[in-house]
């Protein structure tokens, strides 16, 4: 490049050119991209390399397209005046309904198994409270079935020897009277008092209980009750579970109530139903239970209307004459509303139904959805819980706790508790094979209540579940006006199943329905999501630094790509120079003086030499006199070229 052209280009580059006064559109765009706040346009100009420029062009055009698209949607939405109307008829799935008779087995069917136990129970009541003729008010069939086969004078009582009943007097601490022998005995070990379920105005001074010991009788625990009712029933239930645990399942099903016996009439959603719509579920403590709308059905029934007319209506035959007087002290049935894949814990959360009454249960559905980790410690399906599910049902907290306890029971006591399902390769506890199981069970249960087994720490709440809020109301049924004809009709309808005339204390009416179809959903959502986090970051960067996504990309390019690239190049160049110096031997020759074009001070690629640099130049050799005259400089038209480019600059002042 000629020296004059270089001076012209240098001045043109250094002097600012204002936008509207740029001579060409290209210069105007160049100025705009260099001075605009739109980061993408600026990066297109200042980026070095074709690939980077193409990437910045793509980023910028994509951002412009998104802006145009979103703005167009906003404008169209603003000027749209149409109205949309949605009409939705909601239908709710009807839950599964499990119904059990409070009395698990017909007394006439199990009386042969319980004869000795019932006889000793009656003798205990006679000795403790002077109660005579416990079964005299019952029909003759029961009296015959419950006749005593052993007396005090005959064979010694087997059940009272296994678990002796004791009478405690507060005035004599540490001693108790054995009600069978009448002798006082010293009580060693722990004494655990269980509060009574019956309200007392004044606490009795006498306590009734029983003692459980290990095999060697060295370690014992005594359980006392303030009410004799609770003590007798708890003592009776322990022996009852031991006896029934040895009965095969098929025989127990035959000893309990069939669906045709339990269900007198059935209606759902205004349509007739029968025993075929119910599924048998055998519960260890409640016998044969029957589930309506179970998961084994082909389709899950639903309802499209609320109210008692569009739910489940059944009349139940309770058959009070077949009740075990020592096992249960109330008459009626138990009902539980639950999901189709949920195990019915009828003994824990079931609702009792009275006889001679119409029980209406209105339901309201609530669905809960919780967030799993890291927001909470819930589980989706229980796969992350280190407890084996021994129930043939979906995971729940209650299933996990009972499964954990049953597993611990098998590990510690060598057998399983009768009221829960069997773990793999386990057997139910009984006296013959496991004489120590009662003491072990009570000790383990106390540790479970005190949360010492670790079950409460490993079991987690389910993340999603359904819950039905129940509202119960009662009405006398049947009324005195309709009692006569209604009972006669029901007796005639059930003549094939029931060989007696029905009375109202044998029957119970149940209505289960949705109060309305309003479903409440409780859903957890994170208070700070990733979208909200990015939005907050963008708001802060835009407010304080006028920075956007393109600005962030620009920062990444400069400080994480270019910055380290420069450092890498410098280090590489230093390494190359060091290697070159190491391989090249030092020169002993005196360097020749550089003159003319070899002198770096006269490099035409730089600016003109200053006065100081010019003084250091060697004297120029004498040049021959040219044979031609010097050129005419006015013919180069330098003035016109400078004037056209520098019209608004103060060129005269700067030079």
Swiss-Prot record:
Lung and kidney. Residues 77-547 are extracellular. GO terms for cellular component: apical plasma membrane; external side of plasma membrane; extracellular exosome; membrane; nucleoplasm; plasma membrane; sodium channel complex. It is found in: Apical cell membrane. Residues 1-55, 569-655 are cytoplasmic. GO terms for biological process: cellular response to acidic pH; cellular response to aldosterone; cellular response to vasopressin; intracellular sodium ion homeostasis; multicellular organismal-level water homeostasis; regulation of blood pressure; sensory perception of salty taste; sensory perception of sour taste. Originally identified and characterized by its inhibition by the diuretic drug amiloride. This is Epithelial sodium channel subunit gamma. It comes from Mus musculus (Mouse). The gene is Scnn1g.
């Amino acid at each position: 490049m000629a020296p004059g052209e270089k001076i012209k280009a240098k001045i043109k580059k250094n002097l600012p050119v204002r936008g509207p006064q740029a001579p060409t559109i290209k210069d105007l765009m160049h100025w705009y991209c260099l001075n605009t706040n739109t980061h993408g346009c600026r990066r297109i100009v200042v980026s070095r390399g074709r690939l980077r420029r193409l990437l910045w062009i793509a980023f910028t055009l994509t951002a412009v397209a998104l802006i145009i698209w979103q703005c167009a949607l906003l404008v169209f939405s603003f000027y749209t005046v149409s109205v949309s109307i949605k009409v939705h008829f909601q239908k709710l799935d009807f839950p599964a309904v499990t119904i059990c008779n409070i009395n698990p087995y017909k007394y006439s069917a199990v009386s042969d198994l319980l004869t000795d136990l019932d006889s000793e129970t009656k003798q205990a009541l006679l000795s403790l409270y002077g109660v005579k003729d416990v079964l005299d008010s019952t029909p003759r069939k029961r009296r015959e079935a419950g006749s005593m086969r052993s007396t005090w004078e005959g064979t010694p009582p087997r059940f009272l020897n296994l678990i002796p009943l004791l009478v405690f007097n507060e005035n004599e601490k540490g001693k108790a009277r054995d009600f069978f022998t009448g002798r006082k005995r010293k009580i060693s070990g722990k004494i655990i008092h269980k509060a009574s379920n019956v309200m007392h105005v004044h606490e009795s001074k006498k306590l009734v209980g029983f003692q459980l010991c290990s095999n060697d009788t060295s370690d014992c625990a005594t359980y006392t009750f303030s009410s004799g009712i609770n003590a007798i029933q708890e003592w009776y239930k322990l022996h009852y579970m031991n006896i029934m645990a040895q009965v095969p399942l098929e025989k127990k099903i035959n000893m309990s109530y069939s669906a045709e016996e339990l269900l007198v009439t059935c209606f759902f959603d205004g349509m007739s139903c029968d025993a075929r719509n119910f599924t048998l579920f055998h519960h260890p403590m409640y016998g044969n239970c029957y589930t309506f709308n179970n998961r084994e059905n082909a389709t899950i029934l639903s309802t499209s209307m609320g109210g008692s007319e569009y739910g489940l209506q059944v009349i139940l035959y309770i058959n009070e004459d077949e009740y075990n007087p020592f096992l249960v002290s109330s008459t009626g049935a138990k009902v539980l509303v639950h999901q189709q894949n949920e195990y019915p814990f009828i003994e824990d959360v079931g609702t009792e139904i009275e006889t001679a009454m119409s029980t209406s249960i209105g339901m309201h559905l609530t669905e809960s959805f919780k967030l799993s980790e890291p927001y909470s410690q819930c589980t989706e399906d229980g796969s992350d819980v280190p407890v084996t599910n021994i129930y043939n049902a979906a995971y729940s907290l209650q299933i996990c706790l009972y499964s954990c306890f049953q597993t611990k029971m098998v590990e510690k006591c060598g057998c399983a508790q009768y009221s829960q399902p069997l773990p793999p390769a386990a057997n139910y506890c009984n006296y013959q094979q496991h004489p120590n199981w009662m003491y072990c069970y009570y000790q383990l249960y106390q540790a479970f209540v005190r949360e010492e087994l670790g079950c409460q720490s490993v079991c987690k709440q389910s993340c999603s579940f359904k819950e039905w809020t129940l509202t119960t109301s009662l009405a006398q049924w049947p009324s005195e006006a309709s009692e006569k004809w209604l009972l006669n009709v029901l007796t005639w309808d059930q003549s094939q199943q029931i060989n007696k005339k029905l009375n109202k204390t044998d029957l119970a009416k149940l209505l289960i329905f949705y109060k309305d179809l309003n479903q409440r959903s409780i859903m957890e959502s994170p208070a700070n999501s990733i979208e909200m986090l990015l939005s907050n970051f963008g708001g802060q960067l835009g407010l304080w630094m006028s920075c956007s996504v393109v600005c962030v990309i620009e920062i990444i390019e400069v400080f994480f790509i270019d910055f380290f690239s420069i450092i890498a190049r410098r280090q590489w160049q230093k390494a190359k120079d060091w290697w070159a110096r190491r391989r090249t031997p030092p020169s002993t020759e005196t360097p020749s003086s550089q003159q003319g074009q070899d002198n770096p001070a006269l490099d035409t690629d730089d600016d003109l030499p200053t006065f100081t640099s010019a003084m250091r130049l060697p004297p120029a050799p004498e040049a021959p006199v040219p044979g031609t005259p010097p050129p005419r400089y006015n013919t180069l038209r330098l003035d016109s070229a400078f004037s056209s480019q520098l019209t608004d600059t103060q060129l005269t002042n700067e030079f």
